[in-house]
Amino acid sequence: MIPGIFLSLPDLRCSLLLLVTWVFTPVTAEIISLDTENIDDILNNADVALVNFYADWCRFSQMLHPIFEEASNVIKEEYPNANQVVFARVDCDQHSDIAQRYRISKYPTLKLFRNGMMMKREYRGQRSVKALADYIRQQKSDPIQELHDLAEITTPDRSKRNIIGYFEQKDSENYRVFERVANILHDDCAFLAAFGVVSKPERYSGDNIVYKPPGHSAPDMVYLGSMTNFDGTYNWIQDKCVPLVREITFENGEELTEEGLPFLILFHMKEDTESLEIFQNEVARQLISEKGTINFLHADCDKFRHPLLHIQKTPADCPVIAIDSFRHMYVFGDFRDVLIPGKLKQFVFDLHSGKLHREFHHGPDPTDTAPGEEVQDVASSPPESSFQKLAPSEYRYTLLRDRDEL
């Protein structure tokens, strides 16, 4: 008989305890602290990175720390490979240069990176373990819908901006570039792809990418650049996915106000697409050079009744054009005047020159008075900004500075 090895009862209990502890101890993910030495290397090598820009003295940052760490633990179990998902943090007091690099204006700020590229939209959702984990799962999901039938190609949802890629095979550099762009812009466009036999009728000149704009009247547009050139492909698709005139909603209002640019807004009824099309065309014709100085937006009159009341309007008055400078609101006048060449452009120029603000307080400038007409100093008070209320809240963030307003 072969002698066995027997453990004493205390030793057996200890071994079982260690085994149970080993089996049931959850994976603990490390929150990587970023500094000037490691930030580029870590972010560039991460498929997805969620970075918490914080300050220790900020109470909202203190409240987020344990939630952020627990969310990291949850995600680490689902994506165990080192570079699949990275949770990282930056102490903005210790590394003010990094905070300035990413224009951090409030604590905490949660920014998403893909392969080192910062995404335009930061995380603004609920600060809970579940919400953060769900957000990362969404970011890791496939942003491209694969088409399996020609009927799907010919009948996409035309209420959306559709980017459709036609490829001979999925395992190709053309598709990898397309997929990389889709990961970045999937919030702005619907991305679809077809391969092989399904896509063959659309590949008469090789792999290609087609933009199908909303509606049924606008023609499709084909990308004519190199499909292996990421910058060229990204710039072309971004131009199609992010319109010159964007819709403002309660969901994206905080993001738009934080861009810091005044709003030129068309208030219109949702079903009134004609006024929106006129406004879009005139903005493109008259104001394309002002793209970096003002945000061009349109808003649903029914949803934004309160801002309309601020300028003594109701949905029955729509369409209405106004400027919100984050200090005051100014009304354009008769919507039909937008078709007068240069009229809309002058309205925006008068904002930048201070004329709108000046005339609201002191009446028309002397140069605008007809010859022989008596000049009267008619003081008035323009309505206060309504959209500044959508800006980041002091009940959710520590705001670092007040925006200089017009």
Swiss-Prot record:
Disulfides per UniProt: C189-C241, C301-C318
InterPro entries: ERP44, ERp44_PDI_b, Thioredoxin-like_sf, Thioredoxin_domain
GO cellular component: endoplasmic reticulum lumen; endoplasmic reticulum membrane; endoplasmic reticulum-Golgi intermediate compartment
Residues annotated as signal peptide: 1-29
MF GO annotations: protein disulfide isomerase activity
Comp. bias intervals (Polar residues): 378-387
GO BP annotations listed: protein folding
Stretches the record annotates as Interaction with ITPR1: 236-285
Keywords: Chaperone, Disulfide bond, Endoplasmic reticulum, Signal
Subcellular location as annotated: Endoplasmic reticulum lumen
Limits of the Thioredoxin domain: 30-138
Highest taxon, organism lineage: Eukaryota
Pfam families named in the record: Thioredoxin (PF00085), Thioredoxin_6 (PF13848)
Chain residue ranges for the region called Disordered: 360-387
Primary localisation category: endoplasmic reticulum
Motif position, Prevents secretion from ER: 403-406
PANTHER family attached to this UniProt entry: ENDOPLASMIC RETICULUM RESIDENT PROTEIN 44
Assembly, per entry: Forms mixed disulfides with both ERO1A and ERO1B and cargo folding intermediates; the interactions with ERO1A and ERO1B result in their retention in the endoplasmic reticulum. Directly interacts with ITPR1 in a pH-, redox state- and calcium-dependent manner, but not with ITPR2 or ITPR3. The strength of this interaction inversely correlates with calcium concentration.
Record's protein name: Endoplasmic reticulum resident protein 44
Protein's organism: Bos taurus
Source species taxonomy: Eukaryota, Metazoa, Chordata, Craniata, Vertebrata
Encoding gene (name): ERP44
